[in-house]
């Protein structure tokens, strides 16, 4: 039988105390969500009935890991520059379960995928049509000015009498207004089995994640959105959710459908939502995404203009961070950078 020395016994006791303490912290829940760098993705895309081309470089989509923070992660966030905390109600509206939030995120990714494909094909000269049946309310933030006026299941169809048929159109229209503006929202609500046309008025507030960006304050999906594509394109997104991959999905599709590789074998990474008009919008977790890009060896990082001030200080001699507002501008930046 092996006998421990007094010194080794003390070390063993210290180790056990630390191990038990850390294990205990991991079992304690908090009222926060955390965000940390996720893996960069180079999308696997399948095409049917159309010539496509592989490319030598990388067009990485940047991701974050977002989940409920236990006490261990909560403590770790105070010593790590790559982990941020958010109050639970900012991420998870009242009445929405984590499982529902995950499904909403996956659905938003699917919508983003279709919009990205549409943007890339339009730029290549294809005539693309899309149509949804309105903006479906799936959750309402506690601090939203419409928390008593909107209900889950409401179907929004206009802003100030201008029709909207999708979340993409809704966001694009909101960006034509300023924070503090009052807007009139038209909607359809199921009242005791009967559909009623209603209107509400609300002031736009600042987005909880994107500084300077107006919002109403609810989670949404597009009801029955349909795209008419000339051929089938399937982006293998797996379990990645959210709308922030739009820009990079559009760039990947575009680069696969032209014979000349826009990357020129460079490692390029980026993030940004994309709307049907090609405009690029802000994202959350840009700090974590830039960290992930640098870890992947990215030479050029594309970020939405709205996120540029946060991202710019992280630039190094070997990594250039560039602000972009549109798909077309992203192509121009990549072309200029890859031709150096």
Where are these regions (language model features)?
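Extracytoplasmic/periplasmic/luminal assembly and interaction segments
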Residues: 53-103
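Hydrophobic membrane-insertion alpha-helices, especially the h-region
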Residues: 10-29
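Second-shell loop/turn segments in exported
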Residues: 100-111, 142, 157-160, 233-243, ...
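PDZ/PDZ-like domain segments forming the peptide/carboxylate-binding groove
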Residues: 111, 117-158, 162-167, 279-284, ...
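Glycine- and Gly-Pro-enriched alpha-helical subdomains that act as flexible
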Residues: 256, 268, 276-301
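PDZ-domain C-terminal substructure recognizer with occasional recognition of PDZ-binding tails
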Residues: 124, 171-218, 313-329, 333-339
């Amino acid at each position: 039988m092996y006998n421990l020395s007094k010194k080794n016994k003390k070390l063993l006791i210290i180790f056990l105390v630390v191990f038990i303490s850390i294990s205990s912290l991991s079992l304690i829940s908090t009222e926060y969500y955390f965000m940390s760098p996720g893996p960069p993705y180079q999308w696997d895309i399948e095409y049917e009935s159309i010539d496509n081309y592989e490319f030598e470089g990388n067009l990485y989509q940047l991701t974050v890991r977002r989940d409920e923070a236990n006490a261990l992660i909560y403590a770790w966030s105070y010593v790590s520059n790559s982990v941020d905390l958010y109050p639970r109600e900012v991420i998870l509206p009242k009445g929405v379960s984590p499982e529902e939030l995950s499904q909403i995120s996956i659905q938003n990714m699917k919508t983003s995928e279709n919009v990205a494909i549409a943007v890339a094909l339009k730029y290549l000269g294809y005539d693309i049509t899309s149509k949804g049946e309105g903006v479906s309310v799936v959750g309402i933030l506690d601090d939203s000015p419409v928390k008593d006026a909107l209900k889950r299941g409401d179907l929004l169809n206009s802003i100030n009498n201008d029709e909207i048929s999708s979340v993409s159109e809704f966001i694009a229209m909101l960006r034509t207004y300023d924070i503090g503006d009052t807007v009139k929202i038209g909607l359809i609500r199921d009242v005791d089995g009967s559909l009623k046309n209603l209107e509400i008025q609300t002031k736009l507030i600042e987005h909880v994640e994107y500084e300077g960006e107006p919002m109403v304050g609810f989670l949404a999906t597009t009801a029955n959105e349909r795209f008419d594509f000339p051929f089938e394109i399937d982006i293998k997104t797996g379990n990645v959710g959210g709308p922030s991959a739009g820009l990079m999905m559009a760039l990947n599709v575009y680069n696969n459908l032209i014979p000349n590789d826009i990357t020129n074998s460079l490692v390029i990474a980026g993030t940004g939502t994309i709307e049907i008009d090609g405009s690029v919008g802000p994202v959350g977790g840009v700090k974590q995404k830039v960290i992930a890009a640098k870890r992947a060896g990215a030479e050029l990082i594309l970020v939405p203009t709205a996120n540029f001030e946060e991202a710019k200080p992280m630039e190094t001699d070997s990594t250039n961070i560039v602000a972009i507002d549109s798909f077309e501008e992203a192509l121009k930046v990549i072309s200029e950078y890859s031709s150096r």
